[in-house]
């Protein structure tokens, strides 16, 4: 049956009614210039505008999906009309699928939620990404004849072949990929270089292998599953290899592929995390370390799902890194802004960009522990009750380089800051924290954007060389950023307590910055002193009974408290 297209004479809106696969009595779509109402579909209404078209597509059984397609912007919003069909995303990290036994446990965990029909996003098996990178670096200098003998290649092969055998699945699902991996390493050895583009293709083998193994295992235990490579189902990124940004065209492409496959042949989608495809080159790209979280939230937004679950090896987001301080405790609630700041300033639980799709789609993110699924975890939403806690977490970012840039020409000069930051833009270096005065700028550089020890030094030398053309530059290595995340609108009292703690430890704060989002305050200190600072701050902010006084003290007209907070030595 051909589709019928009707154009409304009062606007540019075009409406397409597609033939329905199961429901013959399709409701008439009452058209207005601003909204389209679906009275028989649980009173669902979708706003539209000029240049929009509305399509109603029915799925299998009683399930319906409504799609509002914005033709001009090439974006698509999808709303579930009833509770059946794909319901949530479950993302599992590398430690959660590090062995055959762990994969069995993850499969059992998924089956404990029979009411859910999830999309599963997987990382590479534990330590595989690191081994792939090491193998690539060794291949550059080992020679073609020795590429097959690289230790990390043998470790990768042994792990995946052993896992396949223990899960009792056909080894052919991975053998082709292991052979292709070996040939790639020989190619790197022949060329004697590992470009960013090749590096991304190399590390993609980790997720491609883990998802194929897990999908095959689910099928052997009677759970119908289908494997997907993210770069083949519509994950479109910039061509910034090793750190691609997901483009808006990803959302309708991913939604169409996953929903179309589900409607024709329902099966649990098993999707590679971390990967995409460059929009110009068509080459495999990666989303940066921890990018599987971003894959999960992108799918959640694309499909308009009710929840995104990120399963880790810790009981949710913690008040600090438990390897620094063992008395760290789970944070029950976070806002998207707080979670984004936590991730950006060093918390390893989430990818820095992963909150953006969830925030835009207003989809809750639940961080859970795959080793301890009964733990409540952390729920991340748009807002939370700010009266429940002042701070949510203390984050440490190590290996930070600090730059002091001073110039009397900066005083009253228009465009000086633009010149400084254009240098970083040209060199592709990200800046973390910035503080300015009349004649100087202090800033820190993001270490995650610097590749190796050799490149770090080369890039830093180049930065200093360029900056010295316009200012006096002092480069300070071995620094760390300590960030206090939470409701920092009470910043004066938080600073009072924090500085008292650092003063009693004899620590000199070299720089301080407060984010415009009002959810973080950051201090720069010597890295050697950083862990002790985190421990002392945690004791003061999370283990002191008088912290709640910050919330209940009467305030003066300027917002200041009537009395200062008593701090124990």
Curated annotation (Swiss-Prot):
It is found in: Plastid, Chloroplast. This is Aspartokinase 1, chloroplastic. One of its GO terms (cellular component) is chloroplast stroma. ATP binds at residues 91, 94, 123. Residues 1-90 form a transit peptide. Homodimer. Involved in the first step of essential amino acids lysine, threonine, methionine and isoleucine synthesis via the aspartate-family pathway. Pathway: Amino-acid biosynthesis; L-lysine biosynthesis via DAP pathway; (S)-tetrahydrodipicolinate from L-aspartate: step 1/4; Amino-acid biosynthesis; L-methionine biosynthesis via de novo pathway; L-homoserine from L-aspartate: step 1/3; Amino-acid biosynthesis; L-threonine biosynthesis; L-threonine from L-aspartate: step 1/5. NCBIfam families: asp_kinases. GO terms for molecular function: aspartate kinase activity; ATP binding. S-adenosyl-L-methionine binds at residues 430, 452-453. It comes from Arabidopsis thaliana. PANTHER family: ASPARTATE KINASE, ASPARTOKINASE 1, CHLOROPLASTIC. Substrate binds at residue 207. GO terms for biological process: amino acid biosynthetic process; lysine biosynthetic process via diaminopimelate; threonine biosynthetic process. It is an enzyme of class 2 (transferase).
